[in-house]
Amino acid sequence: MARVHDVAAYILGERGSMTTWKLQKLVYYSQAWSLVWDDKPLFQARIEAWANGPVVPVLYSHHRGAYQISHWPNGSRSGLTTKERETVDAVVNFYGPKTSQWLSDLTHLEAPWINAR
């Protein structure tokens, strides 16, 4: 199982600089799709339903106060297995071109968010 820090590092390595808000949503969708496609969690870190969408608090504690982020020094891109990279790649390819706001709006329409709030 990957560490959430490795997932964040991998996403930033693939997509480059992005808002911390967008990074949080891409990590969230990576976890969601791992549960669906691979029938197991990608990482064990907790995800919470915050006002602007899902947030992984352990990631937030490292980027708090930043708007844009370009690398994740606490993780390693090589910390993911081939299967984990394939799952994250599919998520990043689909959701990566979307804006942070679009991703946040989408999460607010889905059952996990509605049930958590």
Where are these regions (language model features)?
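Domain-edge interaction signal
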Residues: 1-117
